[in-house]
């Protein structure tokens, strides 16, 4: 295989054209677990070890949060996802019967704003509680809004993990809906499912809560270059009573992964192509495109 000069950035993008002159991007990656294409400069915020997840809020704060979420944010995100991405959600019926019960919802991480906007539409009228990067709460004013919209920053250390785990337990006991992106990093318009770890499945395994997943697929759109999105909801998947917590972590992870892989095959438009790039010494070698 012919060696190529090493590029300064592994997330290099090029505009190319296919046979019918339709432009699309190519993202080169080397690590499916850790490469990120969000194009957002991370502040690498670390939460303090004593970060308080269970802050007590008064009636006025709760009322303000309700109005912001249901009266302002929800209508806006619904219109945005429908108009900009042509988003349709299918198979929401599997959630019927679980509106009053707590559950965990996992999704593939393929959009920037839309990935924050889709879960509220899936689980409505339940309010979303979504795991977010600590950068989201770096500034006090923004932190307050993030909390009102259901954002929960992921713990940054083993010490802060204790409070974080306590928050997950409390949400389960209160029958809340928790949204998690197990792939962790954003790959815009990726039509496959990346391998992900089972760490985030510890919580439904410990609390014996049902698990659902949603898979965003990309469909060809008439008269527009960007594809429309269709979101499929699957589940529920339940922890097995005869399994240990660790065994259920793996079991639930595998259930979600296989369901996502199956749904992802329904994508028929590749707006952004992802190409595996291997390294060999000081040279970067371009591999085959990732299907």
List the predicted regions and their residue ranges.
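Short amphipathic alpha-helical segments and helix-helix/interface helices
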Residues: 77, 119-120, 143, 168, ...
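Structural motif corresponding to alpha-helix initiation and N-cap regions
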Residues: 89-92, 139, 161-165
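Short, glycine/polar-rich helix-capping loops at beta-to-alpha or helix-loop-helix junctions
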Residues: 69, 137-142, 221-223
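Catalytic core of membrane glycerolipid acyltransferases/transacylases, capturing the structured
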Residues: 98-158
């Amino acid at each position: 295989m012919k060696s190529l000069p090493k590029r300064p950035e592994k997330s290099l993008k090029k505009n190319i054209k296919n046979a019918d002159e339709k432009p699309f991007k190519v993202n080169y990656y080397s690590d499916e677990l850790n490469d990120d294409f969000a194009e957002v400069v991370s502040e690498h915020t670390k939460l303090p070890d004593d970060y308080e997840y269970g802050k007590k809020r008064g009636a006025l704060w709760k009322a303000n949060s309700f109005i912001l979420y249901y009266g302002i944010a929800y209508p806006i995100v619904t219109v945005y996802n429908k108009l900009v991405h042509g988003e349709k959600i299918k198979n929401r019926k599997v959630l019927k019967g679980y509106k009053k019960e707590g559950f965990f919802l996992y999704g593939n991480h393929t959009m920037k704003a839309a990935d924050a906007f889709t879960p509220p539409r899936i689980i409505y009228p339940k309010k979303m509680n979504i795991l977010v990067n600590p950068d989201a709460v770096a500034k006090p004013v923004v932190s307050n809004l993030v909390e009102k919209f259901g954002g929960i920053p992921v713990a940054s250390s083993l010490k802060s993990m204790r409070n974080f785990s306590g928050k997950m337990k409390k949400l389960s006991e209160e029958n809340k809906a928790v949204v998690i992106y197990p792939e962790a990093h954003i790959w815009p318009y990726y039509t496959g499912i990346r391998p992900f770890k089972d760490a985030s499945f510890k919580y439904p395994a410990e609390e014996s809560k049902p698990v659902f997943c949603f898979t965003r697929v990309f469909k060809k759109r008439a008269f527009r270059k960007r594809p429309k999105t269709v979101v499929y909801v699957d589940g529920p998947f339940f922890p097995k009573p005869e399994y240990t917590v660790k065994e259920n972590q793996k079991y639930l992870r595998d259930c979600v992964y296989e369901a996502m892989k199956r749904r992802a095959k329904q994508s028929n438009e590749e707006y952004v192509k992802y190409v595996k790039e291997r390294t060999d010494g000081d040279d970067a070698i371009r591999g085959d495109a990732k299907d």
